[in-house]
Amino acid sequence: MNTFSQVWVFSDTPSRLPELMNGAQALANQINAFVLNDADGAQAIQLGANHVWKLNGKPDDRMIEDYAGVMADTIRQHGADGLVLLPNTRRGKLLAAKLGYRLKAAVSNDASTVSVQDGKATVKHMVYGGLAIGEERIATPYAVLTISSGTFDAAQPDASRTGETHTVEWQAPAVAITRTATQARQSNSVDLDKARLVVSVGRGIGSKENIALAEQLCKAIGAELACSRPVAENEKWMEHERYVGISNLMLKPELYLAVGISGQIQHMVGANASQTIFAINKDKNAPIFQYADYGIVGDAVKILPALTAALAR
């Protein structure tokens, strides 16, 4: 048996749902989707869900993760085994841990490939900071996985599909986290996972002000702007949501133009699936050139304006 009888899907990020649903179609005979509202439920059915389970009644001061108890109860009531797919987000990982405990299931994070053999999930993911690939065969009846971005292609919606909708009512957990305040966060409005062309900057760009040169190039060629982890996490020059690497975005664009990025393995595992990699770096020995299809050795601050002018013609 190379599929599970049932798979359960939940995504706290709507843009990740099509990818998870495509994976669900390949891994199980029946697809169940937990959703937070009617619009997400309709989307899940169009993407292939046979049953939609609307999570309902959570007080405003409680966390989405506190639905874990009723989610686990619902999963157990409808089968003695099964697969749970979640996005590899912070909330996805926290929810995976809670579900794993309640289902007595093995949990595997950052899955980059998933297959089923003899009714058991086999998962591969990066280990040792991206230096190797680890493989796990999950022996527990339930398997809870968080899926790295780009693991599956996005499922295409079909408005003719039909499915059944159910309601799962909130039950307060014995121990809960109460939200006392919220603060709006300026988040990335661009879905980099879907970008055809990506210009990504590293600390070699020199300063936050010089990022404007990369933005001008993006505008000239219709690309989206990304960055390395140090630019986002250390220098705070760009948003966390835009950094590429093993612990965040895993991209597969047609073109990845790396500007001032050294090319450490932790970054390249997030970009190495690109169809074409073009690197600009003043260090001719930078590791990025081992991955690049094309490269220019030189100062990015001087090269970017010339490249933008040439491509804008």
From Swiss-Prot:
Recorded metabolic or biological pathway in which this protein acts: Amine and polyamine metabolism; carnitine metabolism
Binding site for FAD: 255-283
S-S bonds: none
GO biological process, one term: carnitine metabolic process
UniProt-listed Gene3D superfamilies: HUPs, TPP-binding domain
Pfam short name (any one): ETF_alpha
Domain of life: Bacteria
Coiled coil ranges: none
UniProtKB keywords: Electron transport, FAD, Flavoprotein, Transport
GO molecular function annotations of the record: electron transfer activity; flavin adenine dinucleotide binding
Function: Required for anaerobic carnitine reduction. May bring reductant to CaiA.
Assembly with partners or alone: Heterodimer of FixA and FixB.
Family under the similarity heading: Belongs to the ETF alpha-subunit/FixB family.
Protein name, as recorded: Protein FixB
